[in-house]
Regions:
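Short amphipathic alpha-helix that is part of the acyltransferase structural core
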Residues: 1-24, 92, 96-125
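Conserved donor-binding loop and adjoining core beta-sheet/short helix segment
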Residues: 2-6, 12-70, 149-164
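Conserved acetyl-CoA-binding loop-helix of GNAT-fold acetyltransferases
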Residues: 60-69, 168, 174-191, 209-214
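Conserved active-site tyrosine of GNAT-family acetyltransferases
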Residues: 79, 212, 217
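Conserved catalytic-core motifs of GNAT/GCN5-like acyltransferases
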Residues: 85-96, 198, 218-229
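A conserved beta-strand-loop-helix scaffold within acyl/acetyltransferase catalytic domains
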Residues: 126-136, 141-143, 148-169
Length: 229
């Protein structure tokens, strides 16, 4: 039997109950964007506002709200909903339980320096200095004193925190900077009272996945994107 709700707290409870420790949904639904959620014994889905409606489906056969033009599906079986086509390469969602380990980072405050690194090595980054969601930027320097990598922790409307705009200087890649940076950011976030940090990663970016896993992140969801034809 399919159940539906327009109550945000009920939806959050359903997601926690059904998805357990692999629950990316909690990052995406908020009082500002939540529309509806649906569940049965083994699947969960939700709808939020977004051009005009965007949905997540968890589990094979999860309910697809007909209002959605764009969706992301996390299911063991690969299937294409009727009237939809695959879009892009999908994404993975990772999560870490923060812990104060003493791992060091530099707290970055020079927007020009951060933007220079992003423009040079990751111009498509989603977050820039001054973004209203930013909590703090962290970075590491190489032996020449150059900014080797940087990343930002942001707070989404849901109240949960996400690591974004992770960028490593091209010449400094493959030297462990990303893993060190993420460990340091996790440690500093713990001091700020941030318990969990989420992270989106492209499936093809295997090097990044390995770095995040070494730093303590766990994969909690793999999604395929679809858009209405």
């Amino acid at each position: 039997m399919l159940d539906g709700t327009q109550d945000l707290e009920v939806a959050r409870s359903w997601a926690a109950q059904l998805l357990k420790d692999k629950n990316p949904a909690k990052y995406y639904i908020s009082a500002e964007n939540f529309v509806a959620a649906f569940k049965n014994e083994s699947t969960f889905s939700f709808v939020v506002t977004g051009e005009p409606f965007y949905g997540h489906l968890y589990g094979s056969g999860a309910y697809l709200d007909p209002r959605c033009n764009d969706i992301a599906i996390a299911a063991e079986e690969d299937f294409v909903p009727a009237g939809f086509a695959k879009r892009g390469g999908g994404f993975q969602f990772w999560e870490i339980q923060t812990e104060h380990t003493g791992a060091a980072i530099e707290l970055l405050r020079d927007a020009h320096e951060i933007n220079e690194l992003i423009d040079r090595d990751a111009p498509d980054s989603s977050v820039r200095p001054g973004d209203p969601e930013e909590i703090f930027w962290g970075g590491l320097r190489n032996s020449q004193g150059q900014l080797a990598d940087a990343a930002v922790v942001v707070k989404w409307q849901s109240g949960f925190h996400v690591l974004a705009s992770v960028v490593t200087r091209a010449e400094d890649r493959g030297q462990g900077f990303a893993t060190q940076l993420v460990r340091g950011i996790s440690s500093h976030a713990s001091l700020l009272g941030i318990d969990l940090i989420g992270l989106g990663v492209r499936p093809a970016n295997v090097a990044a996945q390995r770095a995040y896993e070494k730093a303590g992140f766990s994969l909690i969801g793999s999604f395929t994107n679809y858009s209405r034809e």
